[in-house]
């Protein structure tokens, strides 16, 4: 009997063409290939297959893939070559990339530009699926519900996962919807950390921090435009949120400082692991354990609202199942912001029209649109934050942690021009005033060893590298004498403990140990500050500022928490603190209904 490993090796050889005399036939799809090895049953099992019979989340299909090919751990490469089977996205569905009946798509290339060496890359492209028309949505709204739950959560990023887990633990039946082929949302790309005050980590390091200081820093960063009541909850419950995640197995043991904070309060995994993927991996696993896995490929398209303005459920569009109605006693909107919706960005913030975005492709404003259609009120909806350090010419966010750990920011001549740890809006404004509207982050071997994400940027070919400052300046097109003086002055400021030039409050590392590195950056859309207006209990407000019964919201889809400008580390805290609150209050409301 052939073992699974042997069968996987054989199929791998077939896919490479080694056993069939060359490349796959032109236009052949993955499904065509598998049909020669057992027909539809080789992927779908023995049941009759129709488009509607394939589960939208495709979990069974992916289990079948692993039966033959093994798990990601079995097939990923261990060398330095970029391997999509070993990425920050985690162990996502095989079908996220390997579409069976059309040309495969490397989802990494939503952000990157890796060469596509996937099997069947010359298969016909899939026909884009048309958006459901109004008549079809209306028909689904009037149809009998396919399912009913106490709570439906829309969006499986950090806010959505936290809401779903909290609601389930409160005793509610829960459905977690995710429109993409894998979960994580914008949270998957979070690279800085989680701001929290009063944690055991701060106490162990002797960091003197207070709730009042956290609130003041956040209000100052937001230029006083924040909803103070929401900020106070964020600060007061931030430490409990860290403990909540740690109880699921998360590591947030390292504490650093982000821009706009007076002390170290940004918690992240030890060893420089990126915080977003780490938290999402933790939440995915916990949701599975708690019985609320994300239903993937399932887009919420319309909230169901009765004549009393009470939310009663949602219309869902499944990849395979089409439109259907789900009844719910409460709905939590956790669908993220609109940073990838160019039309919405141009409408709400015309000056940002055409600007690149660091956001996940899922950040298209679905939650804002559905809330508006349902009669919800918005707050600060036209406020958008540009992150100062997006990789120039890319969509890759260069984490604030790089500056926090010690990188120096210079312009194209090699001169410093700003306090690297100022707030994001001020840093972005300063960069846009420089020649070429771009800048460079410069650092040395010590920072390269300390901040793990920097090695990821190197892996992607984003870094300039040299054994001398002069060589680095030449590689980056700077004036060697200017850069040499800039770093000499900076190291002297660090040695005496005061930045005479720009007042940088924290200078953890010198830039003195070869090799030296630089990465080119420019501002890009990073966070939509405004959104759905909510109460302190995460209830969505209508246009008369009254809570809409049965509708809750958390995360970037909401407004009010961050004001005009968000501090680095506050978004992750926001998703955890208010995701939990939304789930708990939605469950409480739902369980009180008849």
Question: Where in the sequence are the language-model features?
Answer:
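Beta1/beta-strand and adjacent pyrophosphate-binding region of the FAD-binding site
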Residues: 143-159, 175
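Conserved N-terminal/central alpha/beta ligand/cofactor-binding core
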Residues: 140, 173, 179-293, 297-302, ...
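Glycine-rich loop(s) and the adjacent beta-strand/alpha-helix scaffold that form part
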Residues: 321-322, 326-390, 578-581
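A glycine-rich dinucleotide-binding beta-alpha-beta segment and adjacent secondary-structure elements
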Residues: 302, 482-565
């Amino acid at each position: 009997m052939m073992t699974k490993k042997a069968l996987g090796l054989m199929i791998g050889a077939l896919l490479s063409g080694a056993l069939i005399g060359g490349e796959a036939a032109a236009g052949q799809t993955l499904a065509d290939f598998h049909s020669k090895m057992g027909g539809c049953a080789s992927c779908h099992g023995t049941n009759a297959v129709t488009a509607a019979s394939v589960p939208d989340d495709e979990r069974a299909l992916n289990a079948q893939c692993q039966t033959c090919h093994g798990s990601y751990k079995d097939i990923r490469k261990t060398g330095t070559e970029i391997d999509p089977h070993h990425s920050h996205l985690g162990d996502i569905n095989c079908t996220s990339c390997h579409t069976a009946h059309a040309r495969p798509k490397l989802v990494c290339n939503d952000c990157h530009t890796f060469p596509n060496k996937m099997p069947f890359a010359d298969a016909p492209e899939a026909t884009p699926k048309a958006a459901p028309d109004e008549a079809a949505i209306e028909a689904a709204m009037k149809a009998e519900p396919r399912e009913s739950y106490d709570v439906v959560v829309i969006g499986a990023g950090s806010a959505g996962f936290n809401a779903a887990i909290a609601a389930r633990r409160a005793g509610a039946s829960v459905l977690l919807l995710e429109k993409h082929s894998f979960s994580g949302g914008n949270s998957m790309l979070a690279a800085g950390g989680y701001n929290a005050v009063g944690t055991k980590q701060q106490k162990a390091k002797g960091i003197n921090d207070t709730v009042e200081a956290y609130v003041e820093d956040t209000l100052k960063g937001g230029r006083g435009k924040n909803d103070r009541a929401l900020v106070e909850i964020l600060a007061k419950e931030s430490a409990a949120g860290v403990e909540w995640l740690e109880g699921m197995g998360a590591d947030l043991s390292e504490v650093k400082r982000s821009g706009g904070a007076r002390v170290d309060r940004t918690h992240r995994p030890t060893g420089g692991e990126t915080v977003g993927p780490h938290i999402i991996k933790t939440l995915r696993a916990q949701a599975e354990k708690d019985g609320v896995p994300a239903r993937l490929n399932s887009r919420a398209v319309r909230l169901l609202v009765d004549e009393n303005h009470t939310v009663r459920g949602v219309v869902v569009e499944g990849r395979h199942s089409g439109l259907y109605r789900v009844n719910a006693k409460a709905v939590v909107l956790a669908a993220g912001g609109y940073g990838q919706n160019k039309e919405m960005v141009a409408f709400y913030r015309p000056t940002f029209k055409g600007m690149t975005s660091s956001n996940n492709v899922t950040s298209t404003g679905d939650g804002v649109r559905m809330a508006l259609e349902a009669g919800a009120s918005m707050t600060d909806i036209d406020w958008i934050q540009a992150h100062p350090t997006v990789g120039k010419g890319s969509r890759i966010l260069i984490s604030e942690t790089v500056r926090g750990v010690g990188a120096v920011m210079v312009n194209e001549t090699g001169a410093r021009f700003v306090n690297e740890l100022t707030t994001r809006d001020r840093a972005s404004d300063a960069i846009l005033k420089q020649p070429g509207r771009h800048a460079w982050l410069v650092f040395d071997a010590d920072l390269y060893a300390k901040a793990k994400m920097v090695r990821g940027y190197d892996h992607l070919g984003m870094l300039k590298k040299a054994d001398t400052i002069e060589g680095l300046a030449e590689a980056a097109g700077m004036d060697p004498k200017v850069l040499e003086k800039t770093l000499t002055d900076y190291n002297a400021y660090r040695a005496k403990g005061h930045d005479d030039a720009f007042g940088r409050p924290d200078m953890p590392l010198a830039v003195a140990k070869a090799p030296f590195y630089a990465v080119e950056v420019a501002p890009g859309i990073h966070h939509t500050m405004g959104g759905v207006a909510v109460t302190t209990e995460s209830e969505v407000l209508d246009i008369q500022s009254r809570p809409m019964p049965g509708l809750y919201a958390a995360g970037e889809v909401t407004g009010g928490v961050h004001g005009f400008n968000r501090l680095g580390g506050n978004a992750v805290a926001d998703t955890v603190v208010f995701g939990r609150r939304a789930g708990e209050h939605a469950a409480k409301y739902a369980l009180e209904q008849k």
